[in-house]
UniProtKB/Swiss-Prot annotation:
Belongs to the DMBT1 family. Glycans are attached at residues 638-639, 651, 776, 788, 838, 848, 963, 1078-1079, 1115, 1146, 1150, 1191, 1207. The modification Phosphoserine is found at S1415. Keywords: Cytoplasmic vesicle, Developmental protein, Differentiation, Disulfide bond, Glycoprotein, Membrane, Phosphoprotein, Protein transport, Repeat, Secreted, Signal, Transmembrane, Transmembrane helix, Transport. This is Scavenger receptor cysteine-rich domain-containing protein DMBT1.
Length: 1418
């Protein structure tokens, strides 16, 4: 009877585990041998229950401890047969309950195990699947089952070739959450109506990232004492993964160890940590491997800080709780640690303060446990650079010899036997480049090695983009072959060996020229620098101690200080550009001593509408704040306020006011210590004006944990689970927990609440779900007691907030989340209801419009759809509606039943929103069903754009792409831009140009966060130009998937987005920021002169005094002599004097001069002449300032961009004698308005031309609803008239005042002016009307944008009037006797390209509640 019980337990447990795990792992067991001998073989995967061993102690824990093993016998090969388990020293069989005996899945013919044709092992044979109904949900199940991440695509039509044998399944319909593919709905086994030409395939996210087969395959030899450690590669035995390379036909394998473990991590020899008895590897009793035995930890002083260290060490996220009292059962053996006291930032548990090894005063009833955030989710493989795993082959009873093969760096390959890795850099994303070729690792020569080559390596290793491409064996000299030389990549290749090169093994260099790479992801990891350098003494050079520093590159390099008095040492790197939403950085060599005379700059640049918070977790510097210190700036280093100066012993945090922060670490020439370590993260900039009603205990995982509990966190896996604190125990009072769920792009987030037991009533304890960031997204739902259900976001980001009051706690809640791909529909529904309210019975929609984002406003109230009245209805109310429906911002708020009259009750009237409410019914109103109007006053809304990302209601299709706008002129210090309709599909045949201009002597950096375009760089692409696009060199062409950053050499950059006529995708999103350039030289192009300045210290470094620098031939003229200050030599150079030359060519005007410093007397010279060339280049409306220095060896180039000054004013009459000086300027409707514009510049040979003037009811939108006065020089309005002017530099014109109909309150006028060379009849100013196609891809004229106004029209009465409007109509007076409204006009002087605005404003009923002036309702 006892034996029956034991067998029954094994059947249940192993039947369950093997059905979930053994079919998701694949490796050749190490004990398999054809004709050979196997000794001391250990097969350890730990995350699955598969453990095969011949020398293990007994174990009481079924399925995890090393006393268990599994094998397949009597099947003919190692991957089939009867399942037998080694239990208590004897092999036994396993019953088949729940295991789906004989079922397995694999992907073949795809190049790696995570992509290919889907095949299922059924009844002993591999068969294929038909692609009928095959989609991304089905593919997700396959990817998850194989441990390959999530699905990128689900190709059909035998994309990976036609299979053989039976077609096993057809019409598969998965929901996406099934554990096995055969658990999905399908037609039936072997039932189908298709052929192999329809075989289904899958491409998973982990494709091309797994380690390839190493080249030391031994088909007939002997391998002794081999350790093969892949750490991250775990496969199912049924997949077509490669056979391990130690496979031996006819040979002998001794002491073979195959290690894919994920649950033990360590650094000290013999130390490791694991969690047992918790159901998965991320929860359970804490055990430490010490002196060859596993022991427990006592729970004295055990808290969340200690648990956080364990979770991070195991790659299990962060700690949810730290249970004690042997919650996961009592352990056996020694109690290894007691009184553990971690700060929470230690790398290893044993690094924390503790009582001492094996010293304790407790028993196993106090064994400590941990529950990590990744528990019950698909736990990711811990990054190799963040922890050092203790090999899972540790065998206290066996023998292991010392030969180890452990490719700890990530390798990536496609061709058989080819792979790339980075070594000797401290983590997998930086180091010496090595390629696996013909079975051996070899290096790459640095001839022609540059950032383009490095970018290919970084992208291939999934390490971001390249920060630098160091050569000269920066990461130490390699050994073995030099595999490649003269590598010349374009930067877009998929693999390094796809680039042009000299040929395999062909080179003319030595290992002292080995190439290296530093990728962007390397800077975001903990920079713990190991002793990686060779111990041999390099050849001594004469200038090895010189500090290498350049502000133009993102990293700073210094020589290592060890033994500096005898031998040179390899260099290290510090500083960098950090662009991820969170990460970590530290001083060089941390936790070792930092070097002397260091200056490291970290630029932390996160997404717009976010702030940066830096938390210093460990600061140990030289005492005194004048020697070694850290500076924190609120933006770029050279032009931002100093937030803090951090000195020795300080721990704390600082937050920026924007999305950019600079951190500078400076040390002096003596005394070095441990250094510092810091974490950073981004948080949304709150737009809320009121503080939360409850105190935020913990809102993010990076926040310092509460002494009692933690809650909330950042969830980035494609699926997972979270719950209230202490669930299923009672949650705490006054809690506020925020979970940020961020899944892969082109996916939505769905949260399913499986258990919700809160205090009754929705005003006390509740859960809020937001469609994006908490503070600037619409509320999806308010979940209260008993409200089980699911909610889906419209994007790949959802925020969930749990709030409790000060009394009554209950069980809490538990929720699952998962991601699903965004799909589109071909037929839009006629109405678009979306449940968004606090009350599930309230629904908002827009009807009778052309899409879901415009129409009559209707609310579902008590089961019926009812409209809203237009009394007090304005743009603020409309903004709330648009944001609530995910439709952008409001363009207008038409009333008077513009979209037709509704029927039934009128639910709301006199709605008065501030514009920031989350729901329309949260705005002020008299009450439900309280009104004094009829359906002729039904309110409507027109939103900016239909959202191409459907909401969780009915799906819809974007309207035809006919009236979109893209591109623009960006002048802020930082900002963001994206492709049209992003994240929806961009349109075909798009030509979008963004011109980014920042202040003089700044540089522009653009960071591409997301690039998803049509594959192939000849169809849809982004081009980055180092200045205006039509006259500047191309920096880069960005194609599908090629994210990265690019920096201009001037203060101007152009970005052009081009698409062809077919295939559209998600598009791109980019941020830009500006950074101050070096101050050696400086050039400004002003309206009357150039101002060139040169640093005196720079002149001195070149061997010249400040008086040696002159304008050649003009040094005797007083006006051409420089002003010499304490720091600079400043020249004021007129455009028409001091030797300035003027050259006109191809629609440009160049003003050039140069400065010179030279030896003026003597027979010989030992100093090089110094020439500084300066020029101001005008491109129609843009000044291009260039400054460069030539002195035979040193060239410094400065490029700046500026603008014309333009004065534009209203005049009283056509004589243009008297400008309007009153403000406001009152005019009648249809009154003539006279304007004069003049370009301000000392050069008199310029001309000004009015190219386009467009009117709009909106100040910032001149595309949706416009009226043209003149366009491209072609007059469109009958009242427009130009006048002769006394000078080509002046232009004069007039038009009659007007206003738009349909209650648009304002009219804004935008004019584009062109600057040309006077008397040049070929220029734009003399060509008049030019008809140009909408998407002309040829060169075009840049213009000066000027917006005039405002002009306010006041109605003579406050009575309601109904106005009919055709969108393009402009109202004219009915008769000359009619009383016209008047308008107030403001004019002024504006910089060209700076918008100056003219508005004709129509008012309506007074709304004193908002503090606005009275206006008239029409």
């Amino acid at each position: 009877m006892g034996i029956s019980i034991v067998i029954f337990e094994i059947c249940l447990l192993w039947g369950q585990i093997l059905s979930t795990a053994s079919q998701s792992r694949s490796s050749t067991p190490d004990w398999w041998n054809h004709g050979g001998t196997i000794n001391d073989v250990i097969y350890d995967t730990q995350e699955t229950p598969e453990v095969t061993t011949t020398q293990v102690p007994d174990s009481t824990s079924i399925g995890t401890d090393s006393g268990l093993a599994v094998r397949l016998v009597n099947g003919g090969d190692r991957c089939r047969g009867r399942v037998e388990i080694l239990y208590q020293g004897s092999w036994g069989t396993m019953c088949d309950d729940g295991t789906d005996s004989g079922l397995a899945v694999r992907l073949v013919n795809g190049g790696d195990r995570c992509r290919g044709r889907v095949e299922i092992l059924y009844q002993g044979s591999w068969g294929t699947m038909c692609d009928d109904s095959w989609d991304i949900n089905d593919a997700n199940v396959v990817c998850r089952q194989l441990g390959c991440g999530w699905a990128l695509s689900a190709p059909g039509s035998a994309q990976f070739g036609q299979g053989l044998g039976p077609i096993v399944l057809d019409d598969v319909a998965c929901r996406g959450h099934e554990a096995y593919l055969w658990s999905c709905s399908h037609r039936g086994w072997l039932s189908h109506n298709c052929g192999h030409q329809e075989d289904a395939g899958v491409i998973c996210s982990d494709s091309q990232t797994s380690s390839p087969t190493p080249g030391w395959w031994n088909p007939g030899g002997t391998n002794n004492d081999v350790i093969y450690d892949t750490q991250e590669t775990t496969e199912t035995s049924q997949t077509s993964s490669p056979t391990p390379d130690w496979w031996n036909h006819g040979g002998t394998i001794n002491d073979v160890i195959y290690d894919t473990q994920e649950t033990t991590e360590g650094t000290d020899s013999g130390l490791a940590v694991r969690l047992v008895n918790g159901g998965d590897r991320c929860r359970g009793r804490v055990e430490i491997l010490y002196q060859g035995s596993w022991g427990t930890v006592c729970d004295d002083s055990w808290d969340i800080n200690d648990a956080n260290v364990v979770c991070r060490q195991l790659g299990c996220g962060w700690a949810l709780s730290a249970p004690g009292s042997a919650q996961f059962g009592q352990g056996s053996g020694s109690i290894v640690l007691d009184d553990v006291a971690c700060r929470g930032h230690e790398a290893y548990l044993w690094s924390c303060s503790h009582r001492g090894w094996l010293s304790h005063n407790c028993g196993h009833q106090e064994d400590a446990g941990v529950i990590c955030s990744y528990s019950q989710t698909s736990s990711p493989t811990p990054d190799s650079q963040t922890s050092s795993p203790t090999p899972g082959w540790w065998n206290p009873g066996g023998t292991n010899n010392d030969v180890s093969y452990g490719p700890e760096q990530t390798t990536d390959a496609t061709d058989s036997g080819l792979a790339v890795r980075l070594v000797n850099g401290g983590d997998r994303c930086q180091g010496r480049v090595e390629i696996l070729y013909q079975g051996s690792w070899g290096t790459v020569c640095d001839d022609s090695w540059d950032t383009k080559d490095a970018n290919v390596v970084c992208r291939q290793l999934v390490c971001g983009w390249a920060l630098s491409a160091p050569g000269s064996a920066h990461f130490g000299q390699g050994s073995g072959s030099i595999v490649l030389d003269d590598v010349a990549c374009t930067g877009h290749e998929a693999y390094l060996w796809s680039c042009s090169h000299r040929g395999w093994l062909s080179h003319n260099c030595g290992h002292h020229e080995d190439a290296g790479v530093i990728c962007s992801d390397a800077q975001t990891q903990s920079t713990t620098w190991p002793d990686m350098w060779p111990t041999t003494t390099p050849e001594t050079t004469t200038d090895w101690w010189t500090t290498k520093y350049s502000s133009s590159v993102p990293t700073t390099q210094f020589p290592t200080i060890a033994d500096w008095w005898t031998t040179p040492s390899p260099e290290y790197t510090c500083g960098g550009l950090l662009t991820l939403p969170y990460g970590q950085f530290s001083s060089p060599y941390y936790p070792g001593s930092y070097p002397n005379n260091a200056r490291c700059l970290w630029k932390i640049f996160v997404s717009s509408m976010n702030r940066v918070t830096v938390v210093f977790t460990d600061v140990q510097l030289e005492g005194g704040c004048n020697y070694d210190y850290i500076l924190v700036f609120d933006g770029p280093e050279n032009n931002s306020s100093l937030i803090a100066r951090v000195c020795d012993g300080f721990n704390g945090s600082f937050t920026s006011t924007q999305n950019f922060m600079s951190v500078v670490f400076i040390t002096d020439g003596s005394v070095t210590r441990r250094g510092f370590q810091a974490d950073y993260y981004s948080t949304p900039i709150s737009t809320s004006t009121t503080s939360p009603t409850t105190f935020p205990i913990v809102t993010d995982w990076w926040t310092t944990p509460s002494p009692e509990y933690t809650c909330g966190g950042l969830l980035t896996l494609p699926y997972g689970q979270f719950s209230s604190p202490y669930y299923p125990g009672s949650y705490p009072n006054n809690a506020r927990c925020l979970w940020k769920i961020f899944v892969p792009s082109m996916n939505r987030v769905t949260v399913v609440f499986t258990d919700v037991q809160l205090e009754g009533g929705c005003n006390y304890d509740y859960i809020l779900g937001f469609d994006g960031p908490e503070y600037n997204s619409s509320l999806i739902a308010r979940v209260c007691d008993g409200s089980n259900g699911s909610f889906t976001s419209t994007q790949n980001f959802m925020s969930v907030v749990f709030i409790t009051d000060g009394s009554v706690t209950r069980r809490g809640f538990q929720a699952d989340y998962y991601s699903t791909p965004i799909r589109t529909s071909t037929t839009p529904p006629t109405t678009f209801p979306i449940i968004t309210g606090n009350d599930s019975s309230l629904v908002l929609r827009l009807v009778n419009g052309t899409n879901r984002c415009e129409g009559r406003v209707e609310i579902l109230y008590r089961g019926s759809w009812v409209p809203c009245a237009d009394d007090s209805w304005d743009i603020n109310d409309a903004n709330v509606v648009c944001r609530q429906l995910g439709c952008g911002s409001a363009l207008s708020a038409p009333g008077n039943a513009w979209f037709g009259q509704g029927s039934g009750l009128i639910v709301l009237d006199d709605v008065s929103c501030s514009g920031y409410e989350s729901h329309l019914w949260n705005c002020r109103h008299p009450g439900w069903l309280v009104h004094n109007c009829r359906h002729v006053e039904d309110a409507g809304v027109i939103c900016s754009l239909p959202d191409p990302t459907p909401s969780p209601g009915p799906v819809w299709t974007s309207p035809p792409f006919v009236n979109y706008t893209c591109g623009g002129f960006l002048t802020g210090l930082s900002g963001q831009f994206s492709s049209p309709y992003y994240p929806g599909s961009y349109p075909n045949n798009a030509r979008c140009l963004w011109n980014i201009e920042v202040p003089n002597n700044y540089r522009v950096t653009v960071v591409f966060r997301d690039v998803q375009l049509e594959g192939g760089c000849n169809y849809d692409y982004i081009e980055i130009f180092d200045g205006p696009h039509h006259s500047s060199p191309l920096i880069a062409r960005v194609c599908d998937g090629a994210m990265g950053s690019f920096t201009s050499t001037s203060n101007f950059m152009s970005v052009r987005f081009t698409t062809d006529h077919s295939v559209t995708r998600r598009g791109f999103r980019a941020d830009y920021y500006s950074d101050f350039d070096n101050n050696t030289t400086n050039l400004l192009c002003l309206s009357n002169h150039m101002r060139a300045s040169v640093s005196r210290s720079y002149l001195q470094s070149m061997g010249y005094s400040s008086r040696d620098l002159v304008i050649p031939g003009w040094n005797v003229s007083y006006q051409c002599q420089p002003q010499i200050t304490q720091r600079e030599v400043i020249f004021t150079i007129p455009y028409t004097g001091c030797g300035t030359t003027k050259q006109a060519d191809n629609e440009t005007i160049n003003y050039s001069n140069f400065l010179k410093a030279a030896v003026s007397n003597g027979i010989i010279k030992r100093r090089k002449d110094l020439h500084i060339h300066v020029s101001c280049k005008m491109l129609q409306n843009t000044w291009v300032n260039t400054m460069y220095i030539t002195n035979n060896t040193v060239e410094i180039q400065e490029v700046q961009y500026g603008n014309f000054d333009v004065n534009i004013s209203f005049y009283t009459s056509s004589s243009f004698l008297y400008p309007v000086t009153s403000s406001p300027y009152y005019v009648d409707l249809d009154q003539n308005l006279y304007l004069q514009a003049e370009v301000l510049h000392s050069d008199t040979s310029l001309a000004l031309f009015v190219d386009t003037c467009v009117a709009s009811p909106h100040p910032n939108d001149f595309s949706s609803l416009t009226y043209d006065l003149i366009r491209s020089g072609c007059i469109r309005d009958e009242t427009y008239q130009s006048y002769s002017s006394p000078s080509p530099r002046i232009t004069r014109f007039k038009f009659s005042s007007f206003h738009f109909l349909n209650r648009f309150p304002s009219v804004y006028l935008q004019c584009k002016l062109v600057v040309c060379r006077a008397n040049d009849v070929s220029s734009r100013c003399y060509r008049g009307c030019v008809v140009r196609s909408k998407r002309d891809v040829g060169s075009y004229q840049e213009k000066v944008d000027v917006v005039l106004g405002p002009i306010q029209l006041q109605s003579p009465s406050k009575e309601k009037r109904s106005l009919d409007l055709a969108v393009a109509d402009v109202e004219k007076p009915a008769s000359s006797q009619e009383v016209y409204p008047t308008a107030a006009i403001f004019g002024g002087v504006f910089l060209a390209l700076v918008v100056a605005v003219a508005a004709f404003t129509l008012g309506r009923k007074t709304r004193t509640a908002r503090g606005q002036p009275p206006s008239t309702k029409m």
